[in-house]
Amino acid sequence: MSFSRSEAAPAAPLPDLAATLAAPRDDAFQQLGAAFVTRLPAAPLPAPYVVGFSDDAARMLGLEPALRDAPGFAELFCGNPTRDWPQASLPYASVYSGHQFGVWAGQLGDGRALTIGELAHDGRRYELQLKGAGRTPYSRMGDGRAVLRSSIREFLCSEAMHHLGIPTTRALAVIGSDQPVVREEIETSAVVTRVAQSFVRFGHFEHFFANDRPEQLRALADHVIERFYPACRDADDPYLALLAEATRRTAELVAQWQAVGFCHGVMNTDNMSILGLTIDYGPFGFIDAFDAKHVCNHSDTQGRYAYRMQPRIAHWNCFCLAQALLPLIGLHRDAPSEDARAERAVEDAHAVLGRFPEQFGPALERAMRAKLGLALEREGDAALANQLLEIMDASHADFTLTFRHLARVSKHDARGDAPVRDLFIDRDAFDRWANLYRARLSEEARDDASRAAAMNRVNPKYVLRNHLAETAIRRAKEKDFSEVERLAAVLRRPFDEQPEHDAYAALPPDWASTLEVSCSS
């Protein structure tokens, strides 16, 4: 969602914004009660300063971008004023549970994130959450802080994914501090202001199911349906309809990830959004040299969350959500006994989950057909796309550049093949595939120019490659935030040529292969 400056609401002065956030709130989630949230102020962050800011996210909230320069902005969005807020308006951390790397992990929760309030604009309400705001009752052994490195990565990827058209949480700002924190080495603290209509996760439902709290489970489901899935209210079984919609959104989200070569890295059930958003940017990565078995998370030694595994894991996670919702499914129908209701609930849930492949597969096929510039639907299109991925995998061809350069291929001859062909080690394999591709293009009415234009609207030239983020991070550690701003600006126009920024679209340098990202953020 976006709108022009002229359409935006007048900017609220910072004191008014702070007062709005500090006022007693009516946001529905925190009204669910003490079983769901714990209120506490953020831990003070000394001498905060602005590292990054999203004008676009600000406008989405009805705020003017000039807000970033207002005195006290950094203080407000690292949570420092919250210690002076009334108890009824304090930020809150929510509790949830979940499966981590396929194993039940029990109670988890917002271990370093606090929701400070809601803002309403253009008919929608958005929660504002500070990630890195200090310890909470759910921090376990953590210090409650986020580091500058991971905060910049989350900010940049939130911007990148939104402008790629992929559902995601947003990031309004990154606030830094010189406060040291210990990870694998000494780093500095930062806070990301995350924005979403809701941060409810699969793990919230799992928590109340696992702890046998049916009233809270039903209250949570009713909250999600009432606020985000109102069409489910009128279904024969609202809770089954909720499962169906969440499953569909998840299938379609992961299809979009696969289409741009995005790896999430930590697809635990507590990192799955009930709204089908990309959430919790940690050890993520966009694939450079294509490898279907690519694992972006250095901590994922078993490859559970590899690129090729993401659809299967998403489906598995939906099973976990279904299990948590089973006590609710069928409550609106008359059943001769609780056992009969429960048995029918399992059957109905399995039927919903069985549709996941039917939702994911066509969504990915549509995306791949568009990436190949195919306006017409033909039976062999999926096979053609899969054959391309296979030869890309064999040659470790660059994922993003392969699809971007395919727009130069002509339906008439091989004169435009060189840019993409040069990305392949096995060029004979590419030539064989290109001949099949040209034969398929001959069935299309569009000329090369119009097809190329359409392809360039779906195949990004610019993605957040790890080495680009690393360069911005290294400069930010020296208090030079210009590269964060510059890179964010490039990523906000991923499909545009931007010839002055061609270097951001180039193949990664050799040193990029040594970069590792892990869960230590």
Swiss-Prot record:
GO molecular function, one term: magnesium ion binding
Cofactors named for this entry: Mg(2+); Mn(2+)
Top EC class of this enzyme: transferase
Record keyword GTP-binding present: no
UniProt-annotated binding residues for ATP: G109, G111, R112, K131, D143, G144, R194, R201, D280
Binding-site residues, Mg(2+): N271, D280
Enzyme Commission designation: 2.7.7.-, 2.7.7.108
Pfam families xrefs: SelO
Role description: Nucleotidyltransferase involved in the post-translational modification of proteins. It can catalyze the addition of adenosine monophosphate (AMP) or uridine monophosphate (UMP) to a protein, resulting in modifications known as AMPylation and UMPylation.
Annotated family: Belongs to the SELO family.
Protein name as it appears in the record: Protein nucleotidyltransferase YdiU
Organism: Burkholderia pseudomallei (strain K96243)
Organism classification: Bacteria, Pseudomonadati, Pseudomonadota, Betaproteobacteria, Burkholderiales
